[in-house]
């Protein structure tokens, strides 16, 4: 937000000139109610003790200095015990249009991240079956977060961790092998914990057609072959589903490569040398209690098998070795208990706490016409992400997944999200962009020419309260993006876009654009709409949602 950044810089200079230190608790906020200025600062309240002065007296002193320093300010009111309510000129707000025109698709970007290297790992579903709708929410959050952080000046790399070395993968191979035997008419028994979905039969049938001699193999070799084929087949499907959902992973990292490449053993040795790993009852343990965990954790069981945790430690060690300043893991909410031990691992690797963060994705309750759709991956009873995207479209699905805080449960009604009404959030926002484009097209058809370059004087007719409200809202875009990046919260963007769309729809309903009585206001209002369209398009792009020009 240009206004907030400008006010902050001015206040910091004033405090410095006073020979005082900038207080950590100083804030600049946008008042929720009208009549309290454009911005409110508490600087006099939190600086009074250090200055040895009454807060209101100090506020008066700061206000006088601020008036002399910033010509864009038209009023400073001292409220209550010493709050500074600051109002900026209409010319100042109208410059938002010029900045949007100049920046275009870069409007709202910043250098908040200062090039900090960040890795975002998301989805990382076991390649044991198609992605379901819960994976879709994690995919939308991860992909959008990466877009937002790049726009805010971070150097972001995205990654999918392929869990190809655990028990579930062995079960996958065994399930396909047994299904292949079944298709050949051989008697089989499929235990309860095996994968039973029709896709398992399809994979078995496909492999048998490609390799007629499959069943000539013994059980061990047959299971290995079925595992390799099934994993690659499912992984190819996952990649295609994500591409159709506009989700990109720059790196696909294999867990098996860590085990077979010796990285896990290397990590064990490192922990042992640091006195953080110990043998007990034939198993290898990690002293996670030294880092605040509620109990120590097993790395290698007494039978020699590795726990998931052991690979995860080696994986995160690998991440930091690649030079990332911040590692962000996006996990399902059922993994919340895993966070303390992973933080312990990061600390044991010698990394600072702020170098690791986790975004939790709560469950998606899939509904159809208000009725819950039952889902179970192993039983093969689930709605795939591909089916949902095919039915609702990627735009509606992504926006809906990003419409709420990621760690809050989400009801996703397949019928509701397809409605082309203002009750559908994605339609509401996309229609606002389409409405802007429609007005601009009609203006061109009527021969109304928009100047290639506008200036402040030509925008002077924009002076109404609703126009100033829109301009203040557009000025908040950069701050909203930066805040979403810092908080790892993509839903901040969707909420902001709903607010912008609402303001645009209200403005359009109240104010004539092309049929305005005063001719000198038509072009400025078109310029305002064009700036709104710029923000909507840029914001939707950060969510991976299209900005249609007509609907």
Curated annotation (Swiss-Prot):
Protein keywords: Aminoacyl-tRNA synthetase, ATP-binding, Cytoplasm, Ligase, Nucleotide-binding, Protein biosynthesis
A Gene Ontology BP annotation from the UniProt entry: arginyl-tRNA aminoacylation
InterPro entries assigned: aa-tRNA-synth_I_CS, Arg-tRNA-ligase, Arg-tRNA-synth_N, Arg-tRNA-synth_N_sf, ArgRS_core, DALR_anticod-bd, Rossmann-like_a/b/a_fold, tRNAsynth_Ia_anticodon-bd
Location(s) in or outside the cell: Cytoplasm
Enzyme class: ligase
Keyword Ligase included in the entry's annotation: yes
E.C. numbers: 6.1.1.19
CDD domains linked to this entry: ArgRS_core
Chief place where the protein resides: cytoplasm
Molecular function (Gene Ontology), one example: arginine-tRNA ligase activity
Catalysed reactions, as listed in the record: tRNA(Arg) + L-arginine + ATP = L-arginyl-tRNA(Arg) + AMP + diphosphate
Gene Ontology CC, one term: cytoplasm
Top-level taxonomic group: Bacteria
Family to which the UniProt record says this protein belongs: Belongs to the class-I aminoacyl-tRNA synthetase family.
Quaternary structure, from the entry: Monomer.
Name of protein: Arginine--tRNA ligase
Gene behind this protein: argS
């Amino acid at each position: 937000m240009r206004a907030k950044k400008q006010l902050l810089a001015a206040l910091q200079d004033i405090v410095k000139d006073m020979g005082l230190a900038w207080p950590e608790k100083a804030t600049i906020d946008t008042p929720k109610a009208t009549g309290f200025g454009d911005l409110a600062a508490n600087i006099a309240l939190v600086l009074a003790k250090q200055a040895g002065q009454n807060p209101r007296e100090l506020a008066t002193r700061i206000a006088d200095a601020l008036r002399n320093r910033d010509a864009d300010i038209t009023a400073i009111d001292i409220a209550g015990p010493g709050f500074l309510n600051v109002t900026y000129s209409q010319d100042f707000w109208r410059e938002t249009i010029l900045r949007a025109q100049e920046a275009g698709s870069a409007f709202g970007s910043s250098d908040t991240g200062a090039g900090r290297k960040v890795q975002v790992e998301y989805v990382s579903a076991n390649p044991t079956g198609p992605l379901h709708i819960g994976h879709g929410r994690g995919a939308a959050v991860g992909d959008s977060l990466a877009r937002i952080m790049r726009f805010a000046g971070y150097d972001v790399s995205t990654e999918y961790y392929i869990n190809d070395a655990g028990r579930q993968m062995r079960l996958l191979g065994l399930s396909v092998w047994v299904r292949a035997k079944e298709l050949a008419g051989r008697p089989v028994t499929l235990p309860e914990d095996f994968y039973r979905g029709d896709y398992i039969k399809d994979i078995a049938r496909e492999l048998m057609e490609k390799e007629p001699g499959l069943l000539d193999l013994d059980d061990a070799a047959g299971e290995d072959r079925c595992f390799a084929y099934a994993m690659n087949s499912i992984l190819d499907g996952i990649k295609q589903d994500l591409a159709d959902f506009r989700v990109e992973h720059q790196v696909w990292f294999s867990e098996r490569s860590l085990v077979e490449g010796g990285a896990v053993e290397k990590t064990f040795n490192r922990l042992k040398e640091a006195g953080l790993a110990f043998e007990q009852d034939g198993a290898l343990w990690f002293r996670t209690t030294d880092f605040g965990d509620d109990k120590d954790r097993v790395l290698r069981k007494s039978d020699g098998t590795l726990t998931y945790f052991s690979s995860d430690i080696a994986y995160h060690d690998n991440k930091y070795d690649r030079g990332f300043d911040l590692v962000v893991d996006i996990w399902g909410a059922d993994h919340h208990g895993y966070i303390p031990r992973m933080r312990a691992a990061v600390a044991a690797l010698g990394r600072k706490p702020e170098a690791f963060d986790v975004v939790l994705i709560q469950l998606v309750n899939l509904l159809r016409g208000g009725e819950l759709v039952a889902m179970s991956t192993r039983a093969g009873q689930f709605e795939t992400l591909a089916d949902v995207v095919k039915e609702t479209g990627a735009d509606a699905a992504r926006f809906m997944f990003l419409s709420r805080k990621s760690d809050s449960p989400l009801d996703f009604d397949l019928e509701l999200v397809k409605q082309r009404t203002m009750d559908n959030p994605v339609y509401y926002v996309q229609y606002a962009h389409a409405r802007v484009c429609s007005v601009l097209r009609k203006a061109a058809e009527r021969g109304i020419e928009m100047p290639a370059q506008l200036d402040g004087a030509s925008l002077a007719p924009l002076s109404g309260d609703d126009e100033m409200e829109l301009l203040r809202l557009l000025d908040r875009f950069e701050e909203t993006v930066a805040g979403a990046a810092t908080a790892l919260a993509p839903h901040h963007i969707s909420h902001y876009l709903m607010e912008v769309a609402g303001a645009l729809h209200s403005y359009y309903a109240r104010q004539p654009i092309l049929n305005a009585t005063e001719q000198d206001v038509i072009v400025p209002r078109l310029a305002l709409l064009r700036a709104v369209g710029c923000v909507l398009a840029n914001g939707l792009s950060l969510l991976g949602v299209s900005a249609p020009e007509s609907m």
